[in-house]
């Protein structure tokens, strides 16, 4: 059975008044610039200091959106493309957004001395409660990529009451096996640090094409003044412990797993999905996204993120302004309901008055 898609016209929430003064416009522009820059803080934790950037004035009734980046990146290079994306503004204007840089990874970070004992992945996750306490955040929605996804996963398992939702991009819940360990030892002999990290971040197809994005990140890593810090973070991630996820030891909140088709951690994400509660987990496998979907497909990830937040009870469907106006999009998906049966369904933003796709009560696999 097919459903006819209809175009929905929605007016601006706050249309510009004809007589609005230039002074008001200038004040709005100045406020927008300040919001884009964010407020930077240094937060003391039991395992050292963290560099934290906060955007937005805060809403005590809603969780903060808290992000942690991957190895070889900082919060800006990992998340600016996504969170500055035009359609994402419909989301971020309703939440406080908090970007955490892993120890020593922020732009301009001092280089650690030789022999410095870098924090383990578990210890980095233990630094997060101090951040929540510093800003008086009661709960968060975590958004992590790669190593950041692992850190947020560990934090959520240890502090389930503090996390209302998780978006995990390229998550690998497993510790390295002997084969991985041997492969890394061989890689150390034949590949530079930047090559190892680039292979961690991007798919083989992207590496073969040597895209401009890869060239930019390779140059940034190679020329980074804090290259030693990056290496320490990389080694810490390689030494991570197994999260030991299973249906009896899993997240208590809605989770959205995201991975690019043919991405380095595609198999790990699929395995992680099999270990989570199917009634609270959504799984998105994004075509043509490569290893960094937040950089290559910000529009599709924004769309999925908004549905995820709406499924949690925030931002009702009536708030769909830019996302509804910009285009009518159909997503083909297959999902299992209560683990007992599966079916196919076409999800449309613009049909039937803006009906939403399945909430986090379903496991959904989407090829965008």
Swiss-Prot record:
Keywords annotated in UniProt: Cytoplasm, Developmental protein, Differentiation, Neurogenesis, Wnt signaling pathway
Keyword Transmembrane: no
GO BP annotations listed: cell differentiation; nervous system development; signal transduction; Wnt signaling pathway
UniProt-recorded name of the protein: Protein NDRG2
Disordered: region residues: 330-368
GO CC field: cytoplasm
Compartments it resides in: Cytoplasm
Similarity comment text for this entry: Belongs to the NDRG family.
Bias (Low complexity): 330-339
Protein function: Contributes to the regulation of the Wnt signaling pathway. Down-regulates CTNNB1-mediated transcriptional activation of target genes. May be involved in neuron differentiation.
Record organism: Danio rerio
């Amino acid at each position: 059975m097919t459903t006819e898609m209809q175009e929905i016209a929605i007016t601006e929430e706050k249309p510009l008044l004809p007589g609005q003064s230039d002074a008001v416009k200038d004040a709005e522009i100045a406020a927008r610039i300040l919001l884009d820059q964010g407020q930077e803080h240094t937060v003391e934790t039991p395992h050292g200091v963290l560099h934290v950037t906060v955007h937005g004035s805060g809403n005590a009734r809603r969780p903060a959106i808290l992000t942690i980046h991957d190895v070889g990146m900082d919060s800006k290079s990992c998340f600016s493309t996504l969170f500055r994306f035009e359609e994402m503004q419909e989301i971020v204007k309703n939440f406080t957004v908090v970007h955490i840089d892993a120890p020593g990874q922020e732009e301009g970070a001092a280089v650690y001395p030789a022999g410095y004992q870098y924090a383990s992945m578990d210890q980095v996750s233990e630094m997060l409660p101090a951040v929540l306490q510093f800003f008086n955040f009661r709960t968060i929605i975590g958004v992590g990529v790669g190593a950041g996804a692992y850190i947020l996963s560990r934090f959520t398992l240890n502090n389930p009451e503090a996390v209302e939702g998780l978006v995990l991009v390229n998550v690998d819940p497993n510790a390295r096996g002997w084969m991985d360990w041997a492969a890394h030892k061989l890689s150390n002999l034949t590949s530079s640090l930047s090559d190892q990290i680039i292979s961690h971040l991007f798919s083989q197809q992207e590496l073969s094409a040597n895209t401009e994005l890869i060239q930019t990140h390779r140059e940034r890593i190679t020329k980074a003044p804090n290259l030693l810090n990056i290496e320490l973070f990389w080694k810490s991630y390689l030494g991570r412990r197994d999260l030991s996820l299973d249906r009896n030891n899993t997240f208590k909140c809605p989770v959205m797993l995201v991975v690019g088709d043919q991405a380095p951690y595609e198999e790990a994400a699929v395995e992680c999905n099999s270990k989570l509660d199917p009634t609270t987990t959504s799984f998105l496998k994004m075509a043509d996204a490569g290893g960094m979907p937040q950089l290559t497909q910000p529009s599709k990830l924004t769309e999925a993120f908004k549905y995820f937040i709406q499924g949690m009870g925030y931002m009702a469907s009536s708030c769909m302004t830019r996302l509804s106006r910009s285009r009518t999009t159909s997503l083909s998906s297959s999902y299992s309901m209560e683990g007992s049966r599966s079916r196919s369904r076409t999800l449309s933003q613009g049909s039937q008055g803006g009906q939403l796709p399945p909430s986090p009560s379903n496991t959904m696999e989407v090829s965008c």
